[in-house]
Amino acid sequence: MAGAGGWDPLVGSEIHGFLTYPDLNYEKLVAEAAARWFRPNEIYAILANHARFKIHAQPVDKPVSGTVVLYDRKVVRNFRKDGHNWKKKKDGRTVQEAHEKLKIGNEERVHVYYARGEDDPNFFRRCYWLLDKDLERIVLVHYRQTAEENAMAPPNPEPEVADVPTVNLIHYTSPLTSADSTSGHTELSLPEEINSHGGISASSETGNHDSSLEEFWANLLESSIKNDPKVVTSACGGSFVSSQQINNGPKNSGNIVNTSMASNAIPALNVVSETYATNHGLNQVNANHFGALKHQGDQTQSLLASDVDSQSDQFISSSVKSPMDGNTSIPNEVPARQNSLGLWKYLDDDSPGLGDNPSSVPQSFCPVTNERLLEINEISPEWAYSTETTKVVVIGNFYEQYKHLAGSAMFGVFGEQCVAGDIVQTGVYRFMVGPHTPGKVDFYLTLDGKTPISEICSFTYHVMHGSSLEARLPPSEDDYKRTNLKMQMRLARLLFATNKKKIAPKLLVEGTKVANLMSALPEKEWMDLWNILSDPEGTYVPVTESLLELVLRNRLQEWLVEMVMEGHKSTGRDDLGQGAIHLCSFLGYTWAIRLFSLSGFSLDFRDSSGWTALHWAAYHGRERMVATLLSAGANPSLVTDPTPESPAGLTAADLAARQGYDGLAAYLAEKGLTAHFEAMSLSKDTEQSPSKTRLTKLQSEKFEHLSEQELCLKESLAAYRNAADAASNIQAALRERTLKLQTKAIQLANPEIEASEIVAAMKIQHAFRNYNRKKAMRAAARIQSHFRTWKMRRNFINMRRQVIRIQAAYRGHQVRRQYRKVIWSVGIVEKAILRWRKKRKGLRGIASGMPVVMTVDAEAEPASTAEEDFFQAGRQQAEDRFNRSVVRVQALFRSYKAQQEYRRMKIAHEEAKIEFSEGQLGAACRS
């Protein structure tokens, strides 16, 4: 598989962090596929850019270790049939697969399924696909043969293991090998090296850490040896032995420790900090797993000097009792949990989830404390680009009593990202900070990846200008203010542009009436502004905004009167295609809606893209503006002009849903359906008037004693009933209209007698469909009302089972009893009457007649539907919109936040209705 367009930017780079194809280096990943599992961001990059790679059309037969294959799940549904024998569930038929969702950053983005070989337990398969609905059809299958042995060793460890205090620092991870999805039981396999980098193997690099390791242990144990030469007590907690003892061990020891270490070992090295002592499940390795850990003698030093570049490697420290303690047993039950990479960690619930971090963090070599051990003097730089790796240098000094920790391994926590640091010199640490979500995060230094030992500073991730991520970020406060100012300038330019025109006397009278309806600005608003300015402690920024708004309001009144006097039917648009009402809707000027309504201009005036003021308000989530527009009579069922992305156009509810305003979208969808049905009723497209519909009206007195959550749920249920009833009535009206048109077309295209028969058949079919539909609705309502409790449903099921059995037994009895009589009677009729007396062929000679089927003339059909093509397309689009609207309302039940937004929108609409009614009443009194 090869990539195309190597230097073109990759899709989803802001998520996985690879900007171009060379950054991903897919060829290297394939080469490493047999040695390690892919990371979640690498998997996301491959699946999101699957067009660059080969998609297999058939399952691969018996793939070997290191095979990576891409399939289209919709095309190759049997991609799991690869010829291998995988471990089955208890039924012996279904493959036993465990699954989980992997996180990239803070969000779950990848779904993974694990399977383990039946014949070869060391052979694994992982299937990945994305949680994104648009990309979930592509699956990546990774096969890998691990180097592990059977982890389920005999429970009795060798005697010399219990006699020697040891350093149980085991560098291992394990995939989730098998899990029974039914019972929830998980079988754990403890491989020698399975991780996202392929683990650590014994090599010549092990010896490079000897000198630094000796210095490390010497510094830690020096003070303790002076105090007690027999018992070494470390200030940092954990179990330690000297590097000399480690180096003296045989190179190919089958166990973690051996008898050769016993003679040189310090008698007591079982040192556990208070925090670790209270967590009995922390840092303890199951004794049953010791048999699987082979050839660890060569790797001990390399395991102690942690491979900080590995993403999922982890150290698990075990405390083993020495002979002096009188206890050589190791707990057999160790709490295990799994991180997002499918790796099992033997830690307690309070230990940090290090497997989720981009870099692995070793277990703590210091006491867990909230006390500050170190003071940060300088951080350079204090920011980084969110899509690049940046080198950050931190300078700090340990306090006097903690100087002995200056040589310890240091980690920096940047938000949720833990990064291992390099010691440049004493007090100077270098960190390589990877990509991160833009924004400010907390930064502190730590020795264990969790507990801060320094003050918490601020670190900022910036967006690189010109990157694809910059366009997807939400606008900042400065951008929001700048956009508002631009809209205000456009509105002012549109209102203050003068176009003198001769006014007819009739229009002058009309303009005078409109001017009388619009009251002048109340003096109280000017006085409020003056009082704010008189306050010496007040701020002038909101006063400036209020002053500009009052000026625009006064000018808008004059401008609308001028438009009426000049005889304009609409208010016109500016150079960018928006009118004054659209700009006011964007800015949230609710007072402008009443002025437009009084002046007689349409509230559904469209801009150059077919957007109304309600579309703009819904798109920007302005609930007060939406409520004011709806109370003034704006139509929520209108759609925008079609675009290549949405050929059928978008409603205001669709626009609100696209921006994440689910509650607002549900409210607009409900109002759009009811408004459409009311419009059809007024135009007599349906026989059912709005007053006869079953649209639910909430009675406030019924819900006085309900909590807010219960009220939100009640109103959501009522909204769903309203939307479903309105959609059902609209579709029924459309079917009635279609039947009328088809009847008229058939009557014109066929003779009178034939046409009447066809029309009668069509009416019968239509009535039968309606009857079935109503019957199903009644049955559904009856089921809902009768089976709300478990007891009633259980009784119904038992009764139905008994009735079916009785009916079956009775029918069988009746058939068996009458069978011989029927056969004898038919034989007599055939032989005696038909064949002998009538001299005919009998029943066997009667040809089975073909059923008469009513057909419609094929030549007349195009004539009846030719002019309906665009109507049919429009109706299909309308039905899709209705279904979408019902789904939007139904989505309220998945989010309490959306229910709150819906309730808030409903209350705002009711208040806006009252305010608009009072304004209309005042205008009528003035006129």
Swiss-Prot record:
Residues 826-845 are annotated as: Calmodulin-binding. One of its GO terms (biological process) is regulation of transcription by RNA polymerase II. Residues 757-786, 799-828, 882-911 form the IQ domain. Changing V829R: Abolishes calmodulin binding. Residues 70-96, 830-851 are annotated as: Necessary and sufficient for nuclear localization. Residues 26-152 bind DNA. This is Calmodulin-binding transcription activator CBT. It comes from Oryza sativa subsp. japonica. The lineage of its organism: Eukaryota, Viridiplantae, Streptophyta, Embryophyta, Tracheophyta.
